[in-house]
Amino acid sequence: MTLDLPRRFPWPTLLSVCIHGAVVAGLLYTSVHQVIELPAPAQPISVTMVTPADLEPPQAVQPPPEPVVEPEPEPEPIPEPPKEAPVVIEKPKPKPKPKPKPVKKVQEQPKRDVKPVESRPASPFENTAPARLTSSTATAATSKPVTSVASGPRALSRNQPQYPARAQALRIEGQVKVKFDVTPDGRVDNVQILSAKPANMFEREVKNAMRRWRYEPGKPGSGIVVNILFKINGTTEIQ
């Protein structure tokens, strides 16, 4: 039994119990021997009565001044845009008329007296018979007459020849004179170039266009002559 005591009561526990017991004993001792000090008696207070001066009547509390409301400034009038001055169109001044040129007076030439021509008697050696026609003139008179466009068949459509590009680039004008026949069905046949100025420039276009020409059928014609003009502005004219 004696050997188990140290195990049940260890030293740290005993030390803690002793410290707590000492603290409790100290607190009890200080509470018993505490000196109670009485407060010192209060000293007498002397009071002097003073008659208060006539109190001034309380001034009336003035209400706070009302805030002054400033009047809103009137809006400034919007200035009107300046009116545009009317545009005055000046009338064109009439051109001064040219002064008439003074007409020169034609001096009248004095009339000359014309003497009547005396008729001479006919000489027996003079030949008063009309000259005989030569063989060439007689052949021309008996040849086939040339039919003009106005008196020939009536054209239904005549396409204008195309202006050659080379001639138009060189700004060349030209004229081609053509003779042709019209068949009974109104087609153009036997085309002949009578003249071309300049040569070898417009003839091919003229022939190509005349292939498409059409005349009134049933009215054939032969030896019809027309002039085709090529103008510098690229147009053609058939005369």
UniProtKB/Swiss-Prot annotation:
Q: Where is the composition biased (Low complexity)?
A: 128-151
Q: Which residues cross the membrane?
A: 1-32
Give the TonB C-terminal domain ranges: 148-239
Any one Gene Ontology biological process term? receptor-mediated bacteriophage irreversible attachment to host cell
Q: Where in the cell is it found?
A: Cell inner membrane
Q: Which UniProt keywords apply?
A: Bacteriocin transport, Cell inner membrane, Cell membrane, Membrane, Protein transport, Repeat, Signal-anchor, Transmembrane, Transmembrane helix, Transport
**A GO molecular function for this record?**
energy transducer activity
* UniProt-annotated stretches for the region Disordered: 55-162
Residue spans of biased composition, Basic and acidic residues class:
105-118
For the region 6 X 2 AA tandem repeats of K-P, what residue ranges are annotated? 91-102
Query: Which residues form the sequence repeats?
Result: 70-71, 72-73, 74-75, 76-77, 78-79, 80-81, 91-92, 93-94, 95-96, 97-98, 99-100, 101-102
Chief subcellular location equals membrane
Q: Region annotation 6 X 2 AA approximate tandem repeats of E-P: residue ranges? A: 70-81
Q: Which Gene3D superfamilies match?
A: TonB (3.30.2420.10)
Q: Indicate yes or no for the key word Nucleotide-binding.
A: no
* UniProt family annotation: Belongs to the TonB family.
Give the matching NCBIfam families: PRK10819.1-2, PRK10819.1-4, tonB_Cterm
Function, in words: Interacts with outer membrane receptor proteins that carry out high-affinity binding and energy dependent uptake into the periplasmic space of specific substrates such as cobalamin, and various iron compounds (such as iron dicitrate, enterochelin, aerobactin, etc.). In the absence of TonB these receptors bind their substrates but do not carry out active transport. TonB also interacts with some colicins and is involved in the energy-dependent, irreversible steps of bacteriophages phi 80 and T1 infection.
> What is the protein name given in its UniProt record?
Protein TonB
Record gene name: tonB
